[in-house]
Amino acid sequence: METILNTQFDQLQKAIEGIKEAKSKGQSTDEARIATTLMFVALKHANREVKHKIKAGRDKLHLEKCKVDLSRLQLQNLLYEVSHLKKEIVRCQKFKSRDTSLELLSEAEYSSELPDMPNDAEELSSHKQHLHRLDCELRLRKALDKQYSALLSSKQELLQDNLSHAQRYVSFAPALRTLQSATKPLHDALQLSLDVEWKLSAVVKYLPKPLYVLFIVLQSLQRVSEEQSFTAEVVGYESEAQMQELLKEKKCSTLNYRQTKKESGDREKIADKNNLDDSLAPHPLHICLTIGAAGSNQLVLQIRYFDFIKCATVWGQLNCSRNANGQGDTNFVHHLLRHLYPNDLGNELPIPGIQYELRSSDLTAEECVRYLKAKDYGKPFCWLQSMCSIATVNSSMLYKHELNLNKNNKEIIDRIARRLNSWQRLSQQIRGLTFKDIDLYSLQENIYPAGLSCSLVQWTAITHEELHSQISDALNSSSADKGITYNSYRAVIVRGSAKMECFIRIPSNYPLEMPLWILNVHWNGCLTAQNNSAIKMMEFWTNSLQPKHLEPNDCILYAQLFRTIYSFDIFLETEGSMQNTIEYNKEKPYISAFAKRSRSRPYKYIKKGSVYAFKQ
């Protein structure tokens, strides 16, 4: 448009100059003036177009201005939001959640007691995981609070029940004394001495409650039993028990005084300086339980009670009339008590809530158990607590409170007596085999005396390393170790040029678990259960012997030995028949040396009437 206007202005200027020049020359200027006037019309039209374009430009400029103002307003809003978010970030950084002052569960307790995280736990942030954990712990605490309320109400009911029973017992005592005095003439007429029989020693009343209950039950069992299989007596001095009662009362008064000072606002910390010797001092009186008849080997159990840990312990020792143990296990009394019941090894304090009480004294249950063992006080077995009517919680968190004490204590004493008899017989067998003071041909376990061709030349004790150096499936597939220890022995059986080494492992929980035999035959090479199926079957046949397969009064170790000897004889006789030079002739009565398919040897002995033979 600017170019058009400039062109029109130039043309108009030229036309005016032409008119001026024509006018100066005296020529006619009408046509030129008309043409020039028409140029003004075009100029006017161009001027109008310029005005329209200026107006359109102004409108466009106003529109762009509005857009710029809107953008600036949005920018201000964004800047305000940024400043607000920064303030929120600072506020969040300074924020402290109230759960920081709470004592939350550890990771191990959380994984065991609370439910697992959802499947998309990996995608959750740490904050959301923490919120989930807090929610789970809240539910757990609510459940524990309900359980606490239920237990509290149950405790109140039991207290009311105990109070009513105590009132009944208090009212029953005068009536019983009246009845006793009224029936005394009848006792004298019938020459009864009931008051003398039931009169206890003066020292018994100073026993702690659990030992008192145990002693009374043992006395009742001793009176009703036909044979005197055990005796119980109280060991200790009455003066020491009285002195401990006085010290206990003084200590209680001191603790009450300290508690009063603490409640009155004294913030001084009073620490108990008693060490383990003072805290774990046993009661001066204890029970000595002797199991076994007089004149024979007797098991003496010393049962003590510890008021600090609220449980009883037992320490056992064997009183031998003669050295009957010999090369047997010298710690078999410890093994007998330790494996009397499954999963009751005595390595923990089975008292409910004792860990929390020990924690207040900066002690642990493990420290207490180690101290009791070091001082030869014994171990706190669960079966012993049940004999004393003490409530227990085992490692599986099972609560038990035995109330039928007569039946329970009689069963435990009978079990100890049976285990003691089994261990003594096993020790006698080991001694006889070690010192060779037995006649294998005359033993009742010898099922075929005429055919004993092999001879036992050695029986010695070996180390565990020597036993574990043997490679055997029977040794690898043995049960998992649950506090079980083993004694190992080596027996050598010889026949001609053949020799068999027997490695015997006797577990500490015998007779719950039978002795294990591992066999190695040295004849034309070294034959074991790993490289010879006949030796593997021989091992199985020896180890499959159980007490139910024996005759009454048979010894398990002798029976296993004879099974091994006869199996070795049959192996040599059947294997020797295939050799070029026959060294061992057939002496045992068997029908066939090998089975048709399995090629098994006739190790099994059968007898029907006067007919006996070995078969597969």
UniProtKB/Swiss-Prot annotation:
GO terms for molecular function: mRNA binding; ribonucleoprotein complex binding. GO terms for biological process: male meiotic nuclear division; mRNA export from nucleus; mRNA export from nucleus in response to heat stress. The keyword Nucleus applies. It comes from the Eukaryota. GO terms for cellular component: cytoplasm; nuclear membrane; nucleus; protein-containing complex; THO complex; THO complex part of transcription export complex; transcription export complex. The THO complex is required for cell proliferation and for proper export of heat-shock mRNAs under heat stress. The keyword Membrane applies. InterPro entries: Papain-like_cys_pep_sf, THO_Thoc5. Expressed in ovaries (at protein level). It is found in: Nucleus; Cytoplasm; Nucleus membrane. It holds the Pfam family FmiP_Thoc5. Keywords: Cytoplasm, Membrane, Nucleus, Phosphoprotein. Belongs to the THOC5 family. This is THO complex subunit 5. It comes from Drosophila melanogaster. The lineage of its organism: Eukaryota, Metazoa, Ecdysozoa, Arthropoda, Hexapoda.
